């Protein structure tokens, strides 16, 4: 007997609301999979994870030829992967941008396969957690719609680069786009999330002709899907095989409806400061993502909670609208205060050039 394709786009009746049972979490049940190329700050970031989650398992999944004995002392397991390489996907302001999707898939799955605990946090080597507040969000949003269950439990992801539409002036939709910078969930759910997407071809990664050229959300990018989209689209397709999303320009009303329903029922979206997510490289972006609704297109915690309260639980005490923690409010108002200044200074980038000319001219004369 042939199995019927599962679909969530045309329900025959209003979806049933189901509730996940509360689970007691502790660090001893968690494996941290720290994946990617070793960065100068990686050792310090591993120390922070060890300090904040002392009983957790630390798995470092990186490339062959990157051996350093100091990492052996702080991690429980080290995995050395063969590098599948990256592909040039765009030229932004004449700077080459690389698509590292295949690299992320290889190191993440190698780390997940080595992890021995029932819960896994996937962290990039240029990120860390500065506290353990992550665990407090696990049981906070238990209700879900029964016809949109992709994972056994929601996966926690940050608002940074979790999108519903682009932040470009066109504000084009970007379906199936949860963040891939950090994720925490049950190990079996994490395997479905990151393990369903195959390694993509060079054409898909960086030389794809868009089906609808006038719908490209970010014109400099030449991939078939954004990495985040490819990961989640294939995960969704593993459960709902009738789903079809040919490339990131192939969206319509039905796709957008399905995407939002799957995102809102399978993830917990938190602002970076709510879980202590930190990165030197992405520090400004992380601060911007803490703004409650001020970064166009991002799925912030307030956006997620508004949907959850309206769709699943009218009794939800909305965390992000209830001022949040003092630290969150400090970051929020500081960023709102500085954002106009930063925007103005970026527009005056030329102003620094005369000083740079004087500085390097003087150095050149001095050397002579």
What does each of the following model-derived ranges do?
Residues 1-16, 292-368:
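Membrane-proximal basic amphipathic "stem/tether" segments
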Residues 14-18, 38-52:
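Short, well-formed alpha-helical segments that are part of the catalytic scaffolds
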Residues 123-127:
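Short acidic donor-binding/metal-coordinating loop in glycosyltransferase active sites
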Residues 28-30, 51-60, 76:
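Short loop->beta transition adjacent to catalytic acidic/histidine clusters or analogous donor-positioning motifs
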Residues 129-303:
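Catalytic core and acceptor-binding pocket of nucleotide-sugar-dependent glycosyltransferases
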Residues 30-39:
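A conserved hydrophobic helix/loop-capping motif in glycosyltransferases and polysaccharide synthases
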Residues 120:
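Short aromatic/hydrophobic "clamp" motif used to bind/position activated sugar donors
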Residues 61-114:
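Active-site-proximal specificity loops/subdomain of glycosyltransferases
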């Amino acid at each position: 007997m042939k199995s019927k394709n599962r679909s969530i786009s045309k329900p025959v009746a209003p979806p049933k609301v189901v509730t996940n049972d509360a689970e007691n979490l502790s660090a001893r049940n968690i494996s941290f999979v720290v994946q990617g190329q070793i960065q100068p700050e990686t050792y310090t970031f591993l120390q922070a994870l060890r300090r904040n989650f002392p009983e957790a398992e630390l798995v470092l999944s990186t490339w062959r030829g990157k051996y350093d004995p100091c990492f052996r002392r702080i991690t429980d397991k080290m995995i050395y992967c063969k590098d599948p390489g990256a592909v040039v996907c765009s030229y932004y302001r004449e700077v080459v941008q690389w698509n590292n999707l295949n690299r992320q898939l290889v190191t993440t799955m190698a780390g997940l396969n080595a992890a021995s605990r029932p819960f896994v946090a996937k962290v990039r080597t240029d990120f860390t957690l500065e506290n353990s507040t992550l665990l407090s969000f696990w049981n906070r949003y238990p209700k879900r719609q029964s016809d949109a269950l992709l994972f056994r439990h929601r996966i926690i992801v940050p608002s940074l680069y979790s999108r519903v539409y682009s932040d470009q002036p066109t504000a084009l939709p970007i379906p199936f786009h949860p963040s891939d910078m950090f994720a925490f969930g049950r190990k079996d759910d994490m395997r479905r999330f990151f393990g369903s997407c195959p390694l993509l071809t060079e054409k898909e990664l960086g030389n794809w002709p868009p089906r609808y050229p006038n719908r490209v959300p970010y014109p400099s990018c030449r991939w078939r899907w954004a990495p985040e989209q490819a990961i989640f689209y294939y995960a969704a397709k593993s459960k709902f095989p009738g789903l079809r999303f040919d490339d990131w320009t192939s969206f319509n009303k039905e796709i957008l409806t399905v995407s939002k329903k799957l995102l809102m029922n399978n993830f917990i979206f938190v602002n970076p400061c709510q879980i202590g997510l930190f990165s030197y490289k992405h520090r400004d972006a992380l601060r911007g993502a803490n703004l409650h609704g001020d970064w166009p297109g991002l799925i912030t915690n307030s956006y997620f909670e508004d949907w959850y309260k309206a769709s699943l639980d009218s009794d939800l005490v909305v965390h992000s609208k209830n001022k949040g923690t003092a630290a969150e409010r400090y970051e929020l108002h500081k960023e709102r205060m500085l954002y106009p200044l930063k925007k103005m200074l970026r527009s005056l980038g030329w102003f620094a050039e005369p000083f740079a000319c004087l500085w390097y001219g003087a150095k050149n004369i001095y050397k002579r």
